[in-house]
Amino acid sequence: MNTRPSSHRLFDVGAVGAWDLTASDLPVLQDFFVANPDYFLAVNGMPPRADEAKQEFEDRPPAEMPFDKIHVIGFFDSAGRLIAMASVISHLLAEGVWHIGLFIVASSLHGMGTAASLYAGLEGWMQQQGARWVRLGAVAGNARAERFWERRGFAEVRRREGLQLGKLVQTVRVFVKPVSTSGMQDYLSLVVRDRPESLLP
């Protein structure tokens, strides 16, 4: 299923439109996950669940991790096909910290520079919305993802070990990238849980 959503259009990346998805877009998002299972197989050791898209709209950070808003963003090409998605949390843990929970590009577009250009558009939009730093987690050993984020200018600040993700127990590298005049030390002074010595989950 491919159809442009009726929700709010956030920004464009060339001929690709980025839309703020809503619960009415669950079928097209679930179809996208099923057609592009690589992320779920690598991180969770299993294909996407039958309610994977639904969980993207319902999952929330723990109570001790305050946030402003969750955006589930769909990237649609000029033919109305969903070619990528991102889940973004604004002002997580502190003002100016934007967290990327998921960023998945259709497997058929891997190696073509599509992910890099879509991420650049996403980062620019986040900056316009007040992002000072972008934060995300990458599973240690998922070399493709690690290389991608490092090439985008992200640096590891800490590791979270022993996390149960689906069928697998993983170590997650917490990556941060300053996207304003505020640097990494400013970030670490503000977000205590991401300091290298932190024992917080």
Model-derived segments and their meaning:
Residues 136-146, 163-168:
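Conserved beta-strand-loop-alpha-helix junction that forms the acyl-donor binding cleft
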Residues 81, 106-120, 129, 140-147, ...:
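Conserved glycine-rich acetyl-CoA-binding loop
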Residues 126-137:
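Conserved GNAT acetyl-CoA-binding A-motif
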Residues 89, 160-164:
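Short, solvent-exposed loop/turn elements at beta->coil junctions and helix N-caps
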Residues 70, 170-174:
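Short hydrophobic/aromatic beta-strand or adjacent loop that forms the aromatic wall/cage
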